[in-house]
Structures are given as structure tokens and as C-alpha cells.
Curated annotation (Swiss-Prot):
GO terms for molecular function: 3'-5'-RNA exonuclease activity; magnesium ion binding; polyribonucleotide nucleotidyltransferase activity; RNA binding. Pfam families: KH_1 (PF00013), PNPase (PF03726), RNase_PH (PF01138), RNase_PH_C (PF03725), S1 (PF00575). GO terms for biological process: mRNA catabolic process; RNA processing. This is Polyribonucleotide nucleotidyltransferase.
Length: 732
């Protein structure tokens, strides 16, 4: 049975959900359509009972954009989609983060969600439709799921909020925020903004949530029409006597440890010691307490000696101790108050050969950030279903295992690294200079050297500082902070600049970046249902105060971008040449432009309109390249003095001198010196640079070629070309 439901979101936008036509062997499958953009989402969840030792939900979300969807061929040599692009990875992360909290606690069955974009009108981006389709596929399946989830994008054009703006509308929007949520609450945020206020941010979220409620109701109606029963599921029940024993055995020690301010490594060692001793005690106690008859009568009692289950119970006690300490005493693991930011230290210019660098340390989180400036040739080519462009501003985030004191593999960039780098990039990009203001390609690399929470926000701060150190003219400084939340019933506490443990044991991770004038980027993940707007408002205001405190520290280190670029950064010089001269500068097969680069060390880029950009780290190289290019396109004029290179010598005739690139003239033997010259090679050598004057231009009657007559002796008293004296003589 094919079921189709649709809803009008207003502003001429209609979304439909269809199920029952495609992918019927999956546990659930839906097709979502908006305009001519269509996505199909499927979900399959294994029925194999997970091991009692498993403590995580193996959810895999894959988002793929098929090039046929837009009538395109994949770029590159192989005309087939291969590994996911950065855009696909980021879209998959958005969907994963919104879906994951809505599965039942303890549901550890392997689950795979696959979203394929099968049609793209190149105006409606499919990423948020993928989130809607994924949730709808789970809703119509037999897989347990708490509530329908929907994703929307909110934009604002000319002060008017828009749901799921088109690509063209986003061009003029000052907000681009993706929101995921249920009918009752928001569970995921991510986006970039052009310095909007906290109040405007809340308004955008509320606006998006109203559309989410409608889309969740649409999913509920589709589910009701399908009427498929959910498979039975009950989380693993741990015997109550195990919980009581663990609490008695370790709660007091864990509480004492929680109230002691310690460094991350020392706290981890002492926590590990408590875990080990409690585990040993529990295994010994219950092994002696239960006979084989007891275990036969109640098999669940065997869980009391399962080491993994015991560690989970200890972890539950540890979590409760930390949360009650924060809620009851407003005290945190490292002794800070709820809104206190960790100590900050900043060092600039720490990498001598980089074009800008900074070492930003906040507590036990440290980022070493380097900036590289390049030309348009260094821009990254990005090809998606909706856009093909060159990306000239990028931030790459690296999180090596040593940053958390672990041994791990170094290989391809992980999804987490791509996501964190993208967030930091979006935060800083809002204040980066335009291409017209600063025609460089900018690459920022953040190396996380230590991590105890909020490393992506350290990358925002470090990236801003490195750019300012490198002389990149940022409009304003940007800082970032990660906020946390502990909530039990009506009690709650908002935490500023959270630690790794506070992120892990808490209910929210809310990252906010911005300038003194407003927010430039945000990302939020919620682990609980029922986030009230007044809590969100409190978190945003507390984040604003924290951001300003960090900005104060950053401005103490460097109040504004340096006036000059770093010593080793390339200097860009732009000159305009006639369009018809472009081929002359490039030369046959690029021969001429390569020779200029080899001779001067300058990198040269030529636009179709005749704009020539010269990049070189030395003024001499830039000057040399400019002179060669100007000489290449210059028309030879009689009476002009040139510096040329001897190309060939004919002893009884004269010397052929290249006086402008690719153009030779003859210095007759009689024009070499004032005295009589018997043999040219006695006066000139091949490769020698000589000053010559163009004395005649004429066409060869036999060949029709232009011949240039040069004189060395006529140039003896003339000033060198390029000097003020030469310019004065030319003007006269």
C-alpha cells in the first residue's frame, strides 16, 4: 500500500512524505519531496540480541548525494561516486546527532540509516529533508523510537524569517541555521549568523520549532496510516541488590574525589583505582553470595558478577555524584563556579615560518594554530549538487590521540574532526575579509595538543589570533565557548567552559562563537527531552558573558590585526594587461609563464579579464616578474633603452640581443663600441646582459618579418631603464 501525505509550510513551500512504493524490504523507507528535490531514507535494525557487555548504540547514519540527481557526472577520473564528500559527512552528522537521543535508553541493536538524494532541483538543499526522511522511515518501521523528529533550516532575508530557504535566498540571508527537534523540544542546532543578538537567535529557533511541530504531526499521520506495530523491547534489568552494593561501596569515595580539585590525569588515575577496587569487591561478594541453585532460579543474578555491568553501575554512581554536587552546591570538578572560565594563556608567532600562528591554552585544552596564505590557485575546488565553486577560506582541525594521553591510529580524517573544523571555520568566516579586500586564499590549521573539553572553541580563538598575528585584516575578533547543562526535574544548572567529564556526564553541549556585536556560529546537542526556552535563554546570556571575558584576554594579547603580513607570506601585486596579450604571457604550452616563475620565484595567476596577480615572498621577485610581464606586452619604441641578454654572436656581423622577452634585435658590429671592433666575441659573451637602444624598426622585404636594429654605443650615456632619470628622459 502506497501512502502519501503532504503539508504546506507557507511561503510557497510544500513537503510530502511517501512510503510503500520503494525499498520495501527495509524495516522502514520513506521518500520526502520538496520542489523537485527528493530523498529516500531507509532504516534497518538488527534483531540479533546485543552482548550484555555492550554499552553503546551502534547507529550508523549515511547521507549520499547522487550526481544523477542533478543530471551531472561525478568529477575526476572515475565517473562513479566514491567515498563521501565533506558536505555529505557534515549532513550525516547533523542527522545522527538529532536522531540518536530519541532511541530508547539501552537500545543497543545495530542500526543503519541510509539517506540517498535521488533528485535535486539545485535550489532546495536536501540535507534537512534527509533528517525528516530518516525520522519518518524509523516511525513507519517496527523499530522502537520515542518521538518523531524533524529538521528544518531557518534563514532571514530583509528581516523576514524563512523555512528551508532556497540556495538563492540563502545568498541574501544573514542567518543559516539547521534545527532538529520533536514536537515538544529542540534537540539539535547548528549554523552560522552575521553577528545576530541572543534574542534574535531565540526568535529564529522558535520560528523553526513551529515548522518542526507541523512536520512531526505529518509523520504521526503517516505512521498512523501504516499502523505497523513496534517490536518488543525492554532494556536490560540489573538486580537491585547490585546497585545498592555498588552505591555503598564507592559513593562516599567518589564524592570525596569529586569535591577535590584535581588535574585531569590525576583525577582519571584515582577514579580508575576506585573502579578497580569496587569491581573486585563486587565480584567477590556476589560470587560467594549466590549458589548455583540461586542462579538457576533467577538467571539475572549472574549479571551481578558481570564486570561490564558492574562498571556501568559504578559509572552511574559517579554521574549522580557529580550532578548532585553541581545542583546542590554549585561546585564543579575543578573547583570553579558555574559561570567561571578556566585560566587562559596566549602566545603569538610561535611558528617562525608560518604566515601567522598562535598557541591558545584554556585550562587543560590547548590548540596550536597556523595560518598559510596562498593565491587563487591554492583555493579548494568544491563540487556539490547545488553549487560548484572555489573555496578560498578553510580551517582544518586535527585531534591526535596524544592530546588525551592515548595511543591511537593516525589515518584518514575522522568525521568528528571534519565537523569540529567546519564549525570553527564558519565562526571565523563571518568576519574574514572579502576577496576584493584581501585576495588571498587562507588556510588555518588547528592542531589540538591537549584536550579537556571545548577544543573546537579553542580552535576558534586560536584561529582568530593566528590570523591577526599574520596581518589578515579581520573585521573583528571572534571567541568561542562551550556551555553545559545539568538538569534533574525542575532543577538545572548552566555551566560555562565545560570540561570533558562535564560534557560526558551532563545533558547538553552548546557551543557559541561570536564577536562583541553578535553571534557568528553555534552548535548544540541535547541528551534529554524537555529543554525549556528559558534555559536556552540563560545559556545564551551566560555564553555571551563568557565570550566577552575571553575576548578581553585575546585583545590584551593583540588588540588588532598586525599592519604588515608575515615576513615569509607572499605579497600579491595585481596588474592589468590587454586581453589579447594573455596568450603572449602564458606562451606555448605555458612555457613563458613557467620561465618567469623559474627566474623570479613568483607565482603568477591570470584571469580571463586580463588581471594578472603576482605572488612572491620577496619584493625583488615581484618587481622582476612585473618588469618581465610589462616588457612582454610592451610595444618596442625607437629611442627606448633596454637591458637585454646576448643570445647569439656572429663575429663578423654582430650580436643578437633579446631586448624584450621573446624578441631579439641585431646589434651590428659597428654599433658595439665607439672604437673599431674586429671580432664581436672579444667584446660580448652569450648570456651577458647589456644595455641597448632601439634605433630602427623595419620589415624585411623578403620575409615580411619585423627587424629590430639595436645599438650599444648609442646607449652608453643613457640612464638605465627603470630609473627616475630614464623616466624623465622618456617624458621629455
Amino acid at each position: 500500500m502506497i501512502i502519501t501525505k503532504e503539508i504546506d509550510l507557507g511561503q510557497g513551500k510544500t513537503i510530502s512524505i511517501e512510503t510503500g512504493r520503494m525499498a520495501k524490504q527495509a524495516d522502514g523507507a520513506t521518500v520526502v519531496r520538496m520542489g523537485d528535490t527528493m530523498v529516500i531514507a531507509t532504516v534497518v535494525s538488527s534483531k540479533k540480541t546485543p552482548s550484555p557487555n555492550q554499552d553503546f548504540f551502534p547507529l550508523q547514519v549515511e547521507y549520499r548525494e547522487k550526481y544523477y540527481a542533478a543530471g551531472k557526472f561525478p568529477g575526476g577520473f572515475f565517473k562513479r561516486e566514491a567515498r563521501p564528500s565533506e558536505k555529505e559527512i557534515l549532513s550525516a552528522r547533523l542527522i545522527d546527532r538529532a536522531l540518536r537521543p530519541l532511541f530508547p535508553t539501552g537500545y543497543y541493536y545495530e542500526t543503519q540509516v541510509i539517506i540517498n538524494v535521488i533528485s535535486s532541483d539545485q535550489q532546495n538543499d536536501a540535507d534537512v529533508l534527509g533528517g525528516l526522511a530518516a525520522s519518518a522511515a524509523i516511525m513507519v518501521s517496527d523499530i522502537p523510537f520515542e518521538n518523531a523528529m524533524s529538521e528544518v533550516r531557518v534563514g532571514r532575508v530583509n528581516g523576514q524569517f524563512i523555512i528551508n530557504p532556497t540556495i538563492d535566498e540563502l545568498e541574501g540571508s544573514d542567518i543559516d541555521i539547521s534545527i532538529g527537534g520533536t514536537a515538544g523540544t529542540i534537540c539539535m542546532l547548528e549554523g552560522e549568523m552575521k553577528e545576530i543578538s541572543e534574542a534574535e537567535m531565540l526568535e529564529a529557533i522558535r520560528f523553526g520549532h513551529e515548522a518542526i511541530k507541523k512536520l512531526c504531526a505529518l509523520q504521526d499521520s503517516v505512521q498512523a496510516a501504516v499502523a505497523k506495530a513496534k517490536r518488543p523491547f525492554a532494556p536490560l534489568q540489573v538486580p537491585s541488590e547490585l546497585g545498592a552494593f555498588i552505591s555503598d561501596a564507592c559513593k562516599a569515595r567518589l564524592k570525596e574525589l569529586a569535591y577535590t580539585a584535581l588535574a585531569k590525569e590525576e583525577r582519571a588515575e584515582r577514579t580508575k583505582e576506585i573502579y578497580g577496587e569496587t569491581l573486585k569487591s563486587a565480584v567477590e561478594h556476589f560470587s560467594a553470595a549466590f549458589s548455583s541453585e540461586d542462579l538457576a532460579a533467577d538467571p539475572s543474578k549472574a549479571l551481578c558478577t558481570n564486570e561490564h555491568i558492574i562498571e556501568e553501575e559504578i559509572h552511574s554512581v559517579e554521574k549522580d555524584v557529580m550532578r548532585r554536587m553541581i545542583l546542590d552546591d554549585a561546585k564543579r570538578l575543578d573547583g570553579r563556579t558555574l559561570d567561571q572560565v578556566r585560566p587562559i594563556s596566549i602566545d603569538l608567532g610561535v611558528i617562525p615560518r608560518a604566515h601567522g600562528s598562535a598557541l591558545f591554552t584554556r585550562g587543560e585544552t590547548q590548540a596550536l594554530v597556523a595560518v598559510t596564505l596562498g593565491t587563487k590557485k591554492d583555493a579548494q575546488s568544491v563540487d556539490t549538487l547545488t553549487n560548484s565553486a572555489d573555496k578560498r577560506f578553510m580551517l582544518h582541525y586535527n585531534f591526535p590521540p596524544f592530546s588525551v594521553g592515548e595511543v591511537g591510529r593516525l589515518g584518514t580524517t575522522g568525521r568528528r574532526e571534519i565537523g569540529h573544523g567546519n564549525l570553527a571555520e564558519r565562526a571565523i568566516r563571518m568576519v574574514a575579509p572579502t576577496e576584493q579586500e584581501f585576495p588571498y586564499t587562507i588556510r588555518i590549521v588547528s592542531e589540538i595538543l591537549e584536550s579537556n573539553g571545548s577544543s573546537s572553541m579553542a580552535s576558534v580563538c586560536g584561529g582568530t589570533l593566528a590570523l591577526m598575528d599574520g596581518g589578515v585584516p579581520l573585521k573583528k575578533a571572534v571567541s568561542g565557548i562551550a556551555m553545559g547543562l545539568i538538569k534533574e526535574g525542575s532543577e538545572y544548572a548552566v555551566l560555562s567552559d565545560i570540561l570533558g567529564n562535564e560534557d560526558h556526564l551532563g545533558d547538553m553541549d552548546f557551543k557559541v562563537s561570536g564577536t562583541r556585536d553578535g553571534i557568528t556560529a553555534c552548535q548544540m546537542d541535547i541528551k534529554i527531552d524537555g529543554l525549556d526556552y528559558h534555559i536556552l535563554e540563560t545559556a545564551l546570556e551566560q555564553a555571551r558573558r563568557g565570550r566577552f571575558h575571553i575576548l578581553d584576554k585575546m585583545e590584551e594579547a593583540i588588540p588588532a590585526s598586525r599592519e604588515d603580513l608575515a615576513h615569509y607570506a607572499p605579497r600579491l601585486t595585481a596588474i592589468q594587461v590587454p586581453v589579447e596579450s594573455i596568450g603572449l604571457i602564458i606562451g606555448k604550452g605555458g612555457e613563458t609563464i613557467r620561465s618567469i616563475t623559474e627566474e623570479t620565484g613568483a607565482e603568477i595567476n591570470i584571469e580571463d579579464d586580463g588581471t594578472v596577480t603576482i605572488a612572491c615572498s620577496s619584493n625583488e621577485g615581484t618587481k622582476g616578474a612585473v618588469e618581465i610581464i610589462k616588457a612582454l606586452i610592451a610595444k618596442p619604441e625607437v629611442g627606448t633603452v633596454y637591458i637585454g641578454k646576448v643570445r647569439d654572436i656572429r663575429d663578423e656581423l654582430g650580436a643578437f640581443v633579446e631586448f624584450i622577452p621573446k624578441t631579439d634585435g641585431l646589434v651590428h658590429i659597428s654599433e658595439i663600441a665607439n672604437e673599431r671592433v674586429a671580432k664581436v666575441s672579444d667584446h660580448l659573451k652569450v648570456g651577458e646582459r647589456v644595455k641597448v637602444k632601439l634605433v630602427d624598426i623595419r620589415k624585411d622585404p623578403r620575409t615580411g618579418k619585423t627587424r629590430f636594429a639595436l645599438s650599444i654605443k648609442a646607449a652608453l650615456d643613457a640612464p638605465d631603464p627603470g630609473t627616475e632619470a630614464a623616466a624623465a628622459e622618456t617624458n621629455s
